């Protein structure tokens, strides 16, 4: 009894210490207190539970909040501990363990994660089925001395060739006169007994001098390096052995052979590295005793071999169905697959290596021969026993031995002396199965989620339909037509009986519906699932068709682009050919450009200055226009325009005549063939004038001489009867002349040099249109500034020889005022 927290918190059933004063209490007092204390404590705890107060909460404080360690942090701590343990084990193994001069741990050629099974690799190296981890040399020279080779093999600085070698580079053999050494050698060669046998005589016979002396293989002291190494190796590979059935089998016991640093009178490092070879993958120099691939017999060091592994599990999407007609069932089912590693030299699948060990034994070995150790050839022959003297024939040059024993054919991956990458990493099947199970769980969860969502949506739709049906029925009952409200009120006592009768009559139908509701729901679910599958199949077909249509549309678009490009190239080629042949619109009858001479000569206008030595160009222009008019024949006046193309530039030009009659005929023909869209310009001219436009286009003179009303009319229409009317090129005279020349070149295909005068071509003029069919021809508005020639052909002034009218006088005054 009491309020002490220690009394209440102490367990009554806990054993009392001998120093506890309660242990010396009387028996009856202890029995009485033991019977009363639990009852009182239970009552107090019950009361505390009723009031929400826990025992001891008043006197004790809450412990501070401690942050729990996450899974990632635990994994990181675990990996760090394993890394530190590996570093310690590496240092110990490099100092104490070796196999024929090689090591059982990697030497840092690759700094990545070592995910291979270290216990399996260690066992294979001790069995001499896999080459040990030799120390690789960055450089090697055949001129090195023995001490330099020993220093390079041990990772020490390379001394000078003529320097005195240090003591650590001089191997010290064990003297044969030493009794401890001889006893150690004898004891190390004895096969240790695994346990007590049934024969006691054998125990007595073995308990002599040999068993009483210390032996590294049978000493039970805790300082034995073999037990410690096996314990550390087992601790490092505990996680891998859980998922690996091959490591569950107890490995044979390891023993250490007697220390002998010499092989045939040479240091062991010199014997190994004097005929070194280079690994084709890491480019380091190693002893010639390397692994060789089973397929192409290429050398590969152990550090490079243990880095090669299978690819991660993946789907067989990239595998050709046509090439591999007979695929494994995993690929046909669409499951994850894991392909074996390929040879880095010939890409043969299922990479495996073979190893021919050196003809001596040093370091670690197994006490009892394993089933695979009898097939090792040279390593297990009589010349390479544990303590035999090696003959010179067996210690021949390893290079010559390798060349004489070089394999000429590949070995099977299941051969007993072949070590594959799957043997080094035996957990690949477990990883593949775990990945497949993970994918299956995800797929099942996704399918269940989609199915549940689909069924829930359908159930909600059915519930809404059922509620709507009932509501419509109730609404129909509520809105049933009656004779009147009074009649309904008078018949209200009889409604319950009618409702009961209706319910009794409807009860059999509802019972049948309820009994068949379960089957209906299951059938509806199956039908919905089938509908969903059909919908997904139809959607897949639609997407495939849409993709095919898109591909066809793109192909057609590319074809159209290609056709347009070819058409443009053909047009360019045709134009280039036309220019090179001299048949273009800018060439004359002689093939040379005559723009300055004939293309800009417009005879028959009687305007412009006379240029010297231009009679030939005038004659050529007149002959070209005459031949074009003769070729047109008696066709419609629009034929010239239509032949010129769709630009509206085909205009027939009149010819200048020597007589007045021929000039009148030419003017009438030109006026009849003038297009309707041309600007009317009037030009008074003397009948007998022989003149032409300037050979070089002068736009300013033409623009200054054209006075047209804003309404499109012709200024000075009163003078059209007295003077001739002929078309004059306006702002686009050069382009019109070019089009005329093009038409002329096409028309005179029979004779390009034929000359026809105006009086011969005037007979073939096309008939003029009536006034109602076409508008009046354009007229030329002549200003006082327009140049002209007199009757004699000499240029006396720059004014036309006509009388100015009143309108011209007004215009002249306005121009003078504005100037």
UniProtKB/Swiss-Prot annotation:
Region of interest (Disordered), ranges: 1-79, 190-226, 367-419, 468-522, 549-819
Skewed-composition ranges (Polar residues): 409-419, 674-685
InterPro entries per record: Sip5/DA2
GO cellular component, one term: cytoplasm
Keywords: Cytoplasm
Signal peptide segment: none
Predominant localisation class: cytoplasm
Localization per Swiss-Prot or TrEMBL: Cytoplasm
UniProt feature, compositional bias: Low complexity: 28-37, 210-224, 374-402, 479-513, 575-604, 613-644, 697-714
Biased composition (Basic and acidic residues): 1-11, 65-79, 549-573, 743-772, 798-812
Entry keyword Cytoplasm: yes
Entry's family note: Belongs to the SIP5 family.
Functional summary from the UniProt entry: May negatively regulate the SNF1 kinase.
Record PANTHER family: PROTEIN SIP5
Listed name of the protein: Protein SIP5
Species: Pyricularia oryzae (strain 70-15 / ATCC MYA-4617 / FGSC 8958) (Rice blast fungus)
Gene field: SIP5
């Amino acid at each position: 009894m009491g309020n002490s927290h220690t009394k209440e918190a102490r367990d009554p059933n806990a054993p009392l210490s001998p120093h506890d004063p309660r242990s010396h209490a009387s028996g009856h007092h202890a029995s009485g207190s033991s019977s009363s204390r639990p009852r009182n404590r239970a009552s107090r705890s019950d009361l505390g539970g009723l009031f929400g107060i826990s025992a001891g909460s008043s006197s004790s404080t809450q412990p501070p909040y401690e942050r729990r360690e996450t899974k990632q942090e635990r994994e990181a701590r675990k990996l760090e501990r394993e890394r530190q343990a590996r570093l310690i084990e590496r240092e110990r193994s490099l100092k104490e363990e070796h196999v024929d001069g090689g090591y059982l741990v990697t030497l840092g050629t690759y700094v990545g994660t070592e995910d291979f099974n270290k216990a399996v690799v260690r066992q294979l190296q001790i069995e001499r089925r896999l080459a040990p981890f030799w120390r690789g040399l960055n450089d090697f020279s055949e001129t090195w001395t023995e001490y330099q080779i020993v220093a390079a093999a041990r990772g020490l600085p390379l001394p000078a060739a003529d320097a005195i070698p240090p003591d650590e580079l001089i191997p010290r053999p064990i003297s044969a006169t030493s009794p401890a050494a001889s006893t150690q050698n004898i004891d190390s060669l004895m096969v240790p007994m695994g346990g007590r046998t049934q024969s006691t005589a054998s125990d007595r016979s073995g308990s002599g001098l040999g068993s009483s002396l210390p032996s590294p293989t049978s000493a039970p002291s805790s300082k034995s390096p073999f037990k410690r190494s096996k314990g550390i190796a087992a601790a490092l590979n505990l996680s891998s052995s859980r998922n690996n059935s091959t490591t569950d089998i107890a490995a044979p016991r390891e023993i250490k052979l007697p220390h002998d640093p010499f092989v045939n009178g040479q240091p062991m490092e010199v014997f190994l590295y004097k005929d070194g070879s280079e690994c084709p993958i890491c480019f380091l120099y190693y002893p010639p005793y390397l692994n060789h691939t089973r397929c192409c017999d290429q050398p590969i060091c152990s550090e490079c071999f243990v880095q090669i592994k299978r690819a991660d599990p993946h789907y067989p999407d990239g595998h050709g169905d046509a090439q591999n007609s007979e695929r494994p069932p995993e690929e046909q089912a669409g499951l994850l697959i894991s392909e074996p590693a390929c040879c880095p030299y010939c890409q043969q699948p299922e990479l495996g290596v073979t190893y021919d060990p050196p003809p001596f034994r040093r370091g670690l070995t197994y006490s009892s021969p394993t089933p695979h150790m009898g097939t090792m050839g040279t390593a297990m022959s009589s010349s390479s026993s544990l303590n035999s003297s090696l003959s010179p024939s067996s210690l021949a040059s390893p290079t010559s031995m390798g060349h004489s024993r070089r394999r000429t054919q590949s070995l099977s991956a299941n051969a007993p002396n072949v070590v594959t990458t799957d043997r080094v990493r035996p957990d690949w099947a477990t990883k593949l199965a775990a990945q497949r199970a993970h994918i299956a769980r995800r797929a099942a969860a996704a399918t269940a989620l989609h199915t549940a969502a689909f069924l829930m949506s359908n159930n909600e739709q059915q519930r809404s339909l059922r509620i709507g049906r009932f509501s419509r029925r109730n609404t129909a009952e509520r809105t049933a037509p009656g004779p009147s409200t009074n009649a309904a009120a008078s018949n209200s006592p009889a409604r319950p009986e009618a409702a009961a009768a209706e319910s009794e009559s409807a009860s059999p139908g509802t019972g049948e519906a309820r009994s068949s509701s379960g089957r209906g729901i299951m059938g509806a679910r199956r039908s919905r699932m089938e509908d969903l599958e059909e919908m997904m199949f139809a959607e897949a077909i639609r997407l495939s068709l849409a993709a095919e249509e898109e591909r066809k549309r793109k192909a057609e678009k590319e074809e159209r682009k290609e056709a347009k490009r070819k058409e443009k190239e053909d047009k360019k080629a045709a134009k280039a050919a036309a220019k090179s042949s001299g048949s273009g619109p800018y060439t004359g009858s002689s093939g040379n450009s005559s723009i300055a001479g004939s293309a800009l000569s417009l005879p028959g206008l009687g305007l412009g200055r006379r240029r010297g030595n231009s009679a030939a160009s005038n004659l050529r222009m007149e002959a070209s226009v005459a031949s074009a008019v003769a070729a047109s024949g008696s066709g419609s006046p629009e034929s010239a325009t239509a032949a010129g193309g769709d630009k509206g530039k085909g205009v027939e030009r009149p010819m200048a005549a020597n007589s007045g009659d021929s000039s009148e005929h030419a003017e009438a023909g030109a006026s009849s063939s003038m297009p309707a869209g041309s600007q009317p310009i009037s030009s008074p001219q003397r009948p007998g004038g022989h003149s032409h436009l300037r050979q070089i286009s002068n736009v300013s003179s033409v623009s200054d001489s054209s006075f047209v009303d804003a309404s499109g009319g012709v200024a000075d229409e009163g003078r059209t009867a007295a003077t001739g009317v002929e078309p004059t090129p306006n702002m686009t005279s050069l382009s019109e002349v070019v089009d005329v020349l093009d038409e002329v070149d096409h028309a005179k295909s029979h004779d390009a040099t034929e000359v026809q005068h105006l009086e011969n071509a005037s007979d073939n003029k096309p008939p003029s249109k009536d006034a109602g069919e076409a508008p009046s021809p354009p007229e030329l508005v002549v200003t006082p500034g327009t140049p002209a020639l007199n009757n004699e052909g000499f240029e006396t002034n720059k004014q036309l020889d006509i009388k100015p009218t009143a309108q011209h006088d007004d215009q002249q005054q306005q121009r003078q005022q504005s100037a």
